[in-house]
UniProtKB/Swiss-Prot annotation:
This is Flagellar assembly factor FliW 1. The keyword Transferase does not apply. The keyword Endoplasmic reticulum does not apply. PANTHER family: FLAGELLAR ASSEMBLY FACTOR FLIW (PTHR39190:SF1). InterPro entries: Flagellar_assembly_factor_FliW, Flagellar_assmbl_FliW_dom_sf. Its main location: cytoplasm. The gene is fliW1. Keywords: Bacterial flagellum biogenesis, Chaperone, Cytoplasm, Translation regulation. Interacts with translational regulator CsrA and flagellin(s). The lineage of its organism: Bacteria, Pseudomonadati, Thermodesulfobacteriota, Desulfobulbia, Desulfobulbales. It comes from the Bacteria. It comes from Desulfotalea psychrophila (strain LSv54 / DSM 12343). Acts as an anti-CsrA protein, binds CsrA and prevents it from repressing translation of its target genes, one of which is flagellin. Binds to flagellin and participates in the assembly of the flagellum. One of its GO terms (cellular component) is cytoplasm.
Length: 141
């Protein structure tokens, strides 16, 4: 079992390679390979995943610290094997962001389902957290 603590200085993601999700993303299990793209806007790094099989299947990602979140969770032995992770320092954590409608209008981050990427092996999974220790920092701007 590997303990994962999200760091401020996460390893950089190689945008020239394909990310492989061995089990897909929950709800999109048939889509296992994704290109990752990156854009910086107003100091915010935004990433998005695009399925190699269907360009209409995309996900927007941000680093958790954008929302003042810092993760501390354990990977199961199975998850560690899927990611081919040997050290926690190989892993980067991202959140899927979606645009809400109605009373939930605006951008919403899925904090209970972070994307965990082994940046050295270009393997990823969505970690569905049942219980987690998420430190939230409220920033007055």
């Amino acid at each position: 079992m590997t303990s994962v603590k999200e760091r401020v200085a996460a390893p950089s993601v190689n945008f020239e390679k394909i990310l492989f999700f061995p089990e897909g993303i929950p709800g999109f299990e048939d889509f296992k390979e994704y290109r990752i793209f990156h854009k910086e806007t107003n100091g915010l790094a935004i990433y998005w995943l695009e399925s190699c099989d269907d360009a209409a299947v995309t996900f927007t990602l941000v680093a958790p610290d954008h929302y003042g979140l810092h993760y501390d969770f354990n990977l199961s032995d199975e998850e560690q094997t899927l990611l081919q992770a040997e050290e926690p320092m190989q892993l980067a954590i991202f959140l899927i962001v979606s645009k809400g409608e109605g009373q939930y209008a605006g951008l919403n981050a899925n904090i209970s389902g972070p994307i965990v990427i082994n940046v050295q092996r270009q393997r990823a999974l969505q970690k569905v957290l049942q219980q987690s220790r998420v430190l939230t920092t409220i920033i007055d701007q």
